[in-house]
Amino acid sequence: MSGSYPFIDIAALDSVREGFARGDAQLVLAHDLSTVLWVNGPGAKLFGYNRVEDLIEGQLDLPVATRRQIAAFSSENTSAPSAVAVRLGGGLRSELTHLHVSNIKLPDGVAALLVATQMPDNSAEAAISGLGDDSTHIALVDAVGKVVAASPRFALLDISASTLEDLIVEAGDATDRIVKRRIRTGSHSVPGAIARLTDTPALHLLCIVGDAPAQFQTAAEAVPLPDNAEAVLEEILPEQGDAPAQQAQKTHAEQPRPKTFAFDHDAPPARFIWKVGPDGTFSEISPDLAAVVGPNSADIVGRRFSDVANVFGFDTDGSIAALLLERDTWSGKRLLWPVEGTRLRVPVELAALPVYSRDREFLGFRGFGIVRPAEAEADPEEIGLALAGGIPQNRKPRKEPAETARMVGEDDVLALSEEVANDDHPAAVLPKPPLDITPTPGRRDSDKVISLLNSCAQEKVAANQAKFLKEKERATRPEGGLTKTERNAFREIAERLRKQGLANTRAESETPVSETSSIEPVEPTPPVKTRSEPIQPDETALLANLPVPVIIHSGDAIHYVNQALLDITGYESLDDIRSAGGVDVLFNSESDDGETRQSMVLRHADGSEEPVDAHLNAIAWRGGRALMLSLMPVTAADLPAPAELPAANDEEKQALEAHVEELKTILDTATDGVVLIDPEGRIRSMNHSASALFGYERDEAEGKFFSMLFAIESQRAAMDYLHGLSGNGVLSVLNDGREVIGREAKGGFIPLFMTIGKLPHTRGFCAVLRDITQWKRTEEELTNARKEAERASNQKTEFLARISHEIRTPLNAIIGFSELMADEKFGPIGNDRYRDYLRDINRSGNHVLALVNDLLDISKIEAGALDMQFEAVSLNDAIGEAIALMQPQANRERVIIRSSFQSNLPDIVADSRSIKQVALNLLSNAVRFTAPGGQVIVSTSYELNGDVVMRVRDTGIGMSKSEVEQALKPFRQINALERRKAESAKDWRNEGTGLGLPLTKAMVEANRAQFAIDSNPGQGTVVEIVFPPTRVLAD
């Protein structure tokens, strides 16, 4: 069992051992939440692994939400477990699981996180599931030495009961609950350890490291023979002449066969996770994809997406490659992925979102995919067969008559795409010739040493080989044959071969191929050298003489290149290509400006590049499958002719240059800073204003990240603004700019207003930066002035409150004593003039008291400190009470008060006391400034739009617009009122204080209503108060 910590050391920790004994799923994570330090069997099963070794010291890809929840707990620095509800599962199914997370200390004192949850199966067998192999043995032992549960091969160790009892006693005496020593098993001793997990009841974990004795393994695997074994063997023994062949077959059968991938067409859709870096290189992919398409097909980590797409033949329009450059979220992209060992492709749907670091540096994409095996379709390129590394066992060649051998020509080159250097033929296809086979155990069938005994047998074998090659060629090709482009390319190669006379050269080679027209009798040849030696010329003769570059490879491993490729690239040998970097160094899929090319470019040894056309085919190679990549240099004639542009004369050229210079001069003259940014977020150039604004020289800032121009607190906002414009979202349409803080080269800070726009052709950006220092200074001055005004208002309110308190007490005494003296309770005054003086004192005192109260109320309203109790108020009732109070005064002034209330008027939400005060103030003003015989009309209404309206109309003297504005100001009285006072010769004590209308308006607005006044001189005044629908309690 691998890992930085012994398995039993962590299993014996106080925070782990009891849960381990119960069979809980347990997982110990490092604080990066990715590295698995320890896990038990149920824990590995919980996260989709069958064995503990598959997960320990590995990387666990937890969902983002789960990471966030666990990370939040880990920062609390407490050992108490915390419950976290997360969704776990693979594919399209996930289940809500309640995990318990706690901080623990490992044996060496390092802090870690323990993630645990209870499992439905809490048996002893479940507790040690996923543990033990041929060299590691696990068991749970109770207090008396009885084995409760054990790994499959534990019984073969033959540990005695007395040995187990001694181990239990030693574990009980150990202070750390662990004993490590050599343990007697049968006739020898092996290293082991035992840990005491629980005390009541006692349960121990026993770990043994070492192989079981050989005699037990043999006995366990032996099968008893029947009594008549010798007779049976004599009946089934072959003839002596077939013994060598059967011995070879037996040797081949005894070789261990690797486990092959089997595609399940009826499997449900599977979901997998993938990651790519900023350069498009796959950095991670979950095993769910390999479970469907095969491990070789899913082995793309470390490869760029463009290379995988070129090899697998998807994303031919470059749409996904373009999305990887956009750095924006995308989804719903569908491609066809080859299935290992089959002629099928399965649809895969991909989605991804960009990943950034804390410094807003682009880290690549993280996404998921859904692969649907039930919707698999035929792959005309049969790429999956090349990925399998050999011919599938279920492939059977068709039975067709042998055809007459042909000279090397067009058909030979076409056959080359499927059968190059293939000498691994199933024995069932060829008839059994007389062979002299030298047995060599441990070697492949294709490496057996074969000598032909006579020319007749050689001709027979050659004919059958030709038949097999033809049948195999038809079996490995798709039913539709080669595509039109591939067939034309190979025909061109064949034509060149004819012109150069390569057909005669190939016909006269030392080892003729199986498709020659006739085979000359030859003498028996000595055994051929084994495959461990260099490849023989007969396997690569045709490839070596081809005039076009050819590469035979499997993934990143290059098996063979011909001389034409070495000549065109400038490398001396295949080893030089491998040491330089292999396939990746030969091809360049990106142009100098970072954009992905649509065509393939071959890179030479000196760094120069050349465009080529590539044709990829799956072929048989050294008993397995590989890919043959044939390249055809693209000549100038093959390139599309550029569109003919009208030739510009010197005058047009000069005019264009002058126009460009004018634009540059305009940009440099502008007071705003202009910065050009490339798609990577780096500065391309800036104008003079931007250079002066930040204090950078132009060449000093070019190539640096755009974020360097901003303070730390504004860098994220600026880069978010930039990335938001790179897509086609809301920001690209509603571009309203940002306020940011710029950073000068010397460290100073500047308030800026930034607007960024997209450049149409280069996919870059243009940022316009304006210095708003003066704006900020003005804004600060306004803010300070507002604060000063608020402070003054608060001082006034505080002053009025104090004055009110100081005046109210003596004023109440004056009013009270005047009333007491006027009543003559302690004797007659004796003079009527004194009685008039007392009434004047009383009236004046009440007037001053009302003035103080009004001043205090209006100051409280302005400061927002007036206590108001909002409740349901019947407006009709409140106005009715005010009319009843004002009726005596109206009678004395000979003014008629009329009312018109709407029935079923809904209640309003308001302060009852202030509403009555508003009605009294309005009625008092209306009666006071209406001549005898005039009318005051009070009405209420419920409008169609939901408003409740109160109107007070009089037939008084009226006011002009300027007089209305003056009347609404505190302590202001209009001239018309002064004239009326002089005309009527009323006592000044009956006049107002100038606070009536301002106080009324303030109270109305404090009740969330609207106050309006309309008046004309000589025509009267109308005051309207509107309560909006939000303040109306309608049914």
UniProtKB/Swiss-Prot annotation:
Q: What is its EC number?
A: 2.7.13.3
Q: Which InterPro entries match?
A: HATPase_C_sf, His_kinase_dom, HisK_dim/P_dom, HisK_dim/P_sf, PAS, PAS-like_dom_sf, PAS_fold, PdhS_histid_kinase
Catalysed reaction(s) here are: ATP + protein L-histidine = ADP + protein N-phospho-L-histidine
A Pfam family of the record is PAS_8
Q: What residue spans carry the region label Disordered?
A: 500-533
Q: Which residues are in the PAS domain?
A: 659-730
* Cellular component aspect of the GO annotation: cytoplasm; plasma membrane
Spell out the coiled coil positions from the record.
Answer: none
Q: What positions are modified (Phosphohistidine)?
A: H805
Residue ranges for the region (Interaction with DivK) are 614-1035
Sequence segments annotated as region (Important for polar localization): 1-613
Annotated Histidine kinase domain ranges read: 802-1031
Annotated GO biological process? cell division; regulation of DNA-templated transcription
Q: Which GO terms describe its molecular function?
A: ATP binding; histidine phosphotransfer kinase activity; phosphorelay sensor kinase activity
Q: Where in the cell is it found?
A: Cytoplasm
Q: Which UniProt keywords apply?
A: ATP-binding, Cell cycle, Cell division, Cytoplasm, Kinase, Nucleotide-binding, Phosphoprotein, Transferase
What is known about its subunit structure? Interacts with DivK.
Its job: Functions as a polar differentiation marker. Essential protein that, by localizing in the old pole of dividing cells, controls cell division and maturation, probably through control of DivK phosphorylation status and cellular distribution, which in turn regulates CtrA, a transcriptional regulator of the minB operon. The asymmetrical localization of this protein is probably required for cells to enter a new division cycle.
In Swiss-Prot or TrEMBL terms, this protein is called Cell-division control histidine kinase PdhS
Q: Origin organism of this chain?
A: Brucella melitensis biotype 1 (strain ATCC 23456 / CCUG 17765 / NCTC 10094 / 16M)
